[in-house]
Design a protein with these regions (language model features):
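Asp-based, Mg2+/Mn2+-dependent phosphohydrolase catalytic module
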Residues: 2-24, 37-61, 65-237
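Conserved phosphoryl-transfer catalytic core
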Residues: 28
Length: 237
């Protein structure tokens, strides 16, 4: 299992050794993971292709696709979904059989939404307070881009959470759903899997929680270095 953001690239810039790293990874079963809810697996494949690296779509798991799979397993078909997120996330949720709505939802899904507004926040809060399930793609408060730090999906989740009594189910790293899907895709026991990432709080903590060996890439280390999430291996990147 390999994190994409900060390990393979940052924004639209490939990190040194990208193609060599993926050639090495391809000698074993692998899956690439990202908490970026603005991409589907197909988008991830296209992005890597632009950087000169070709991977099969079956080897990419984005949090948009993982969230759609989670909803399909947790809710009846045609459930009403209020999605605050990108076109990729909305398309994935609709593809999972959910009906996209703007209010009075059965489930509220929060991802990275650059069009987030007071009105959309209001409808999300009203739906959750009326009993809708509350699902977050991730709790990452910020994203690293070529231009610096920008608010992540977790910042928007926090805005809704501040107004409701319901704790959201988080699908993405470091939570269990996405890691369990990745382990299932690999068809291996967790103890046979190496999780490579640059984020102590999501990649390393989540990989360890599922039972994988963890490796920290120093290419873009994030997280609380003084915390309890210590990797088994460390690479300079």
């Amino acid at each position: 299992m390999v994190d994409m953001d900060g390990v393979l690239y940052r924004g639209e810039q490939a990190l040194p050794g990208l193609r060599d790293f993926l050639l090495l990874a391809a000698t074993h079963p692998f899956v690439l993971l990202t908490n970026n809810s603005t991409m589907t697996a197909g988008d991830g494949v296209a992005k890597l292709s632009r950087m000169g690296a070709d991977v099969p779509v079956s080897s990419v798991l984005t949090v948009s696709d993982a969230t759609a799979r989670y909803l399909a397993s947790a809710l009846p078909a045609s459930s009403r979904a209020l999605v605050l997120g990108s076109a990729a996330l909305r398309g994935a949720v609709a593809g999972a059989g959910m009906e996209l709505v703007d209010a009075a939802a059965d489930v509220v899904v929060i991802g990275l939404d650059t069009n987030f507004s007071y009105d959309s926040l209001t409808e999300a809060v009203r739906s959750v307070n009326s009993g809708a399930r509350f699902v977050a793609t991730s709790l990452d408060p910020v994203l690293l881009t070529e231009d610096g730090v920008v608010p992540g999906a977790g910042a928007l989740v926090a805005a809704v959470r501040a107004c409701v009594s319901t704790t959201p189910v988080c699908v993405g790293k470091p939570s269990a759903p996405m890691f369990e899907m990745a382990v299932q895709a690999l068809g291996l026991a967790p103890t046979e899997i190496l999780m490579v990432g640059d984020n102590l709080d999501s990649d390393i903590a989540g990989g360890a929680a599922v039972g994988a060996t963890t490796a920290l890439m120093l290419s873009g280390v994030r997280g609380h270095a003084g915390g309890h999430h210590r990797p088994d291996l460390v690479f300079a990147g």
